[in-house]
């Protein structure tokens, strides 16, 4: 039997008791949402149960997306009253107001653009707090990257011409940058070219096989979690946090939270790092399945 299956079977029942959880932080794509980029009915049902029966329990979304792209999810689940983590920890909001924000240095963004500009198959994007800007498109001009990001709900502008001159100004422009390539060889070449940038200037993180993100070195979902506890919920300790995720970019949350659950369909690095693993995939409502077991949600609740 493969070791991954052994890990899943060993970990699927390692779950906390309801009284041990004071905050839940949850990744979005591949975790709360299924492959169709929509929340599974099982997840919606479980979140409804929590909001009705544990209305003071914070449920924090933590995603690489911008805040605008998950507004429909936040409102549908009644999560607008809680903090949220966006751009993989670069921006933290509380009730719509920014409480923590980080950006890549303009000089670094210029260097990254220069290093990646001639990789034919790659698309490159820059993110600020409101929009995604396409800096470079794939050579075949089929715009797979833009189509993918728009499918995920991002507001993408076809080119970054209006933003690039601002990289020469005093205000750092991009909170993060994203490399997209359907060809994994292109992604590996991009990573190789960026490897020479000192680790105290930039960090690379990955949630999906066809893309990776370039973020400030001291900002990720784990750092954002600590910011939320210190600035918004100082009475809650990390040991009473439950984290859900499926990607390499969620491991930093798993390393801090007292309880962590990887989605069964997630990346091997996430499955290895989490204390528990869901019994079903994101396509089957993994978050809801785990919450049903923790909170003993009645089968007839709707």
Swiss-Prot record:
<dbReference type="GO" id="GO:0016791">
    <property type="term" value="F:phosphatase activity"/>
</dbReference>
<keyword id="KW-0378">Hydrolase</keyword>
<dbReference type="GO" id="GO:0005829">
    <property type="term" value="C:cytosol"/>
</dbReference>
<keyword id="KW-0539">Nucleus</keyword>
<dbReference type="InterPro" id="IPR036412">
    <property type="entry name" value="HAD-like_sf"/>
</dbReference>
<keyword id="KW-0963">Cytoplasm</keyword>
<protein>
    <recommendedName>
        <fullName>Uncharacterized hydrolase C215.10</fullName>
        <ecNumber>3.-.-.-</ecNumber>
    </recommendedName>
</protein>
<dbReference type="Pfam" id="PF08282">
    <property type="entry name" value="Hydrolase_3"/>
</dbReference>
<dbReference type="InterPro" id="IPR000150">
    <property type="entry name" value="Cof"/>
</dbReference>
<dbReference type="InterPro" id="IPR006379">
    <property type="entry name" value="HAD-SF_hydro_IIB"/>
</dbReference>
<dbReference type="GO" id="GO:0005634">
    <property type="term" value="C:nucleus"/>
</dbReference>
<dbReference type="InterPro" id="IPR023214">
    <property type="entry name" value="HAD_sf"/>
</dbReference>
<comment type="similarity">
    <text>Belongs to the HAD-like hydrolase superfamily.</text>
</comment>
<dbReference type="GO" id="GO:0000287">
    <property type="term" value="F:magnesium ion binding"/>
</dbReference>
């Amino acid at each position: 039997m493969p070791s991954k299956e052994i890990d899943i079977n060993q970990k699927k029942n390692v779950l906390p008791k309801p009284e041990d959880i004071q905050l839940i932080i949850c990744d979005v794509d591949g975790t709360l949402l299924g492959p169709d980029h929509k929340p599974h009915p099982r997840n919606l049902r479980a979140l409804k149960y929590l909001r009705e029966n544990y209305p003071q329990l914070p449920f924090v979304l933590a995603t690489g997306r911008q805040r605008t792209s998950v507004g429909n999810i936040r409102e549908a689940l009644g999560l607008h009253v809680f903090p949220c983590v966006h751009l993989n920890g670069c921006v933290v909001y509380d009730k719509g107001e920014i409480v923590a924000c980080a950006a890549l240095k303009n000089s670094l963004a210029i260097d990254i653009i220069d290093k990646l500009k001639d990789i034919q198959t790659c698309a490159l994007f820059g993110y600020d707090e409101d929009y995604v800007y396409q800096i470079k498109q794939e050579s075949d001009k089929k715009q797979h990257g833009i189509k993918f990001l728009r499918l995920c709900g991002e507001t993408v502008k076809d080119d970054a011409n209006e933003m690039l001159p601002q990289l020469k100004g005093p205000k750092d422009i991009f909170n993060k940058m994203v490399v997209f390539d359907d060809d994994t060889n292109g992604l590996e070449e991009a990573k190789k070219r960026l490897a020479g940038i000192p680790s105290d200037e930039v960090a690379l993180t990955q949630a999906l096989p066809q893309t990776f993100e370039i973020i400030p070195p001291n900002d990720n979902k784990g750092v954002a979690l600590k910011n939320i506890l210190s600035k918004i919920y100082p009475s809650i300790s990390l040991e009473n946090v439950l984290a859900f995720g499926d990607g390499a970019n969620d491991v930093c949350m798993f390393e801090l939270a007292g309880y962590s659950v990887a989605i069964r369909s997630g990346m091997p690095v996430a499955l290895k790092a989490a204390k528990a693993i869901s019994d079903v995939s994101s396509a089957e409502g993994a978050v809801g399945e785990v919450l049903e077991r923790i909170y003993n949600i009645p089968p007839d609740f709707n």
